[in-house]
Amino acid sequence: MYPLIPQTGCKVALLFKQLGIRNVLWLVMAALTEQKILFHSESFARLTDSCTALTALLYPFRYCHTFVPILPTSLIEVLSTPTPFIMGVHSMHDRELNEVLDTIVVDLDGGAVTLPENYTIYKVWIHFFTHIYLVIRYNFLIF
């Protein structure tokens, strides 16, 4: 039996509104390919909602790596782990964010997604990305 569809309220819609279709699709592809994803914001609620929304978008798959929507200051060195993760940190840690390597950094306040230099996307993902982008953009007429 399949797990229940995740109940997110308006969290998924808010993620699309904050980041746009293209950036959210980049994040979904990154999560599916086991990349490190780091959200940062001034709002703890926005961090939690965005991390939860991203994992909900993976349905019917489940995210099985490290998931910490709000990383405490005392554990900030965990960001240098080599394993995939989805984590959120308060924006007051800007200095530490500049030192994070091989990580996709998501600025929820500015609506920007920064991909690492070594991040490559395979041709099969380009086709998937383009198709899904067009379906969302033209059939649902959002953003």
Range-by-range predicted roles:
Residues 1-143:
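Acidic, Ser/Thr/Pro/Gly-enriched alpha-helical scaffold modules and adjacent low-complexity linkers
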